[in-house]
């Protein structure tokens, strides 16, 4: 998991659209902390700081420690609503991480040792089907990324979830199938060349070039010839 982020917050005393608009005019973003078998906690955070953390690129996959009222609450961002025109954050949801609990998260995959893949060396292309894996993880063991080794992979090979050794405390959220994460495919130029060869091999032969004995007794109209009665 990426290093935890710290986000100072203040309690939100009033709810409703009017109160939320007033907070936004003051440069604050209304938010809520929920989950963990506790009542939701309404808060508001500084807009500039929230934007800064969003710009890290890993905010939604980071533990965010929210400081409020002298306490620190470990959370995981679940949603940030943005204004449709300005893209400014309008509201944020944080899921409270209960001690000893588990949570479903999306964790990015990173492919390693591409230089050790014969297929990639020959010009093959890694076609990534899933850029993230849906995992069920222990709250204190959320991985920042999943490394996938492509050493020895040839063109035509596929990488399935069953091949991946997940970190301790993590398991796939999808358990009903051995889904594909990536495949190693031939470059488009090679595919086109192979396709042309297949077309040439499968071309129909001109009937005039076939000996009469091999034309199965069909006449010029394509009907089977019959002997005289």
Swiss-Prot record:
Top-level taxon of the source organism: Bacteria
Gene Ontology terms for molecular function: 5S rRNA binding; structural constituent of ribosome
GO cellular component: cytosolic large ribosomal subunit
Keywords: Ribonucleoprotein, Ribosomal protein, RNA-binding, rRNA-binding
Alphabetized InterPro entries for the sequence: Rbsml_bL25/Gln-tRNA_synth_N (IPR020056), Ribosomal_bL25/Gln-tRNA_synth (IPR011035), Ribosomal_bL25_b-dom (IPR020057), Ribosomal_bL25_C (IPR037121), Ribosomal_bL25_long (IPR001021), Ribosomal_L25_dom (IPR029751), Ribosomal_uL5_bac-type (IPR020930)
Pfam families given in the database record: Ribosomal_L25p (PF01386), Ribosomal_TL5_C (PF14693)
Chain segments annotated as coiled-coil in the UniProt record: none
Alphabetized PANTHER family for the sequence: RIBOSOMAL PROTEIN L25/GLN-TRNA SYNTHETASE, ANTI-CODON-BINDING DOMAIN-CONTAINING PROTEIN (PTHR33284), RIBOSOMAL PROTEIN L25_GLN-TRNA SYNTHETASE, ANTI-CODON-BINDING DOMAIN-CONTAINING PROTEIN (PTHR33284:SF1)
Function: This is one of the proteins that binds to the 5S RNA in the ribosome where it forms part of the central protuberance.
HAMAP family xref list: Ribosomal_bL25_CTC (MF_01334)
Similarity-based family: Belongs to the bacterial ribosomal protein bL25 family. CTC subfamily.
Protein name: Large ribosomal subunit protein bL25
Organism: Erythrobacter litoralis (strain HTCC2594)
């Amino acid at each position: 998991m990426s290093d935890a982020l710290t986000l100072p917050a203040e309690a939100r005393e009033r709810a409703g659209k009017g109160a939320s608009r007033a907070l936004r005019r003051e440069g604050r973003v209304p938010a809520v902390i929920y989950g963990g078998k506790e009542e939701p906690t309404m808060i508001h955070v500084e807009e500039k700081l929230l934007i800064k953390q969003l710009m890290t690129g890993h905010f939604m996959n980071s533990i965010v420690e929210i400081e409020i009222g002298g306490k620190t609450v470990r959370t995981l961002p679940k949603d940030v609503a943005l204004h449709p025109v300005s893209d400014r954050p309008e509201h944020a949801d944080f899921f409270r991480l209960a001690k000893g609990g588990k949570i479903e998260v999306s964790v990015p995959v990173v492919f390693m040792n591409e230089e050790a893949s014969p297929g990639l060396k020959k010009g093959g292309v890694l076609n990534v089907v899933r850029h993230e894996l849906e995992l069920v993880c222990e709250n204190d063991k959320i991985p920042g990324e999943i490394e996938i080794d492509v050493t020895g992979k040839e063109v035509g090979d596929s990488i399935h979830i069953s091949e991946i050794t997940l970190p301790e405390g993590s398991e796939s959220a999808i358990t009903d199938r051995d889904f594909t994460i990536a495949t190693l495919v031939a470059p488009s130029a090679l595919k086109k060349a192979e396709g042309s060869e297949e077309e040439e091999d499968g071309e129909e032969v001109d009937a005039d070039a076939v000996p009469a004995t091999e034309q199965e007794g069909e006449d010029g109209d394509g009907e089977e010839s019959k002997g005289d009665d």
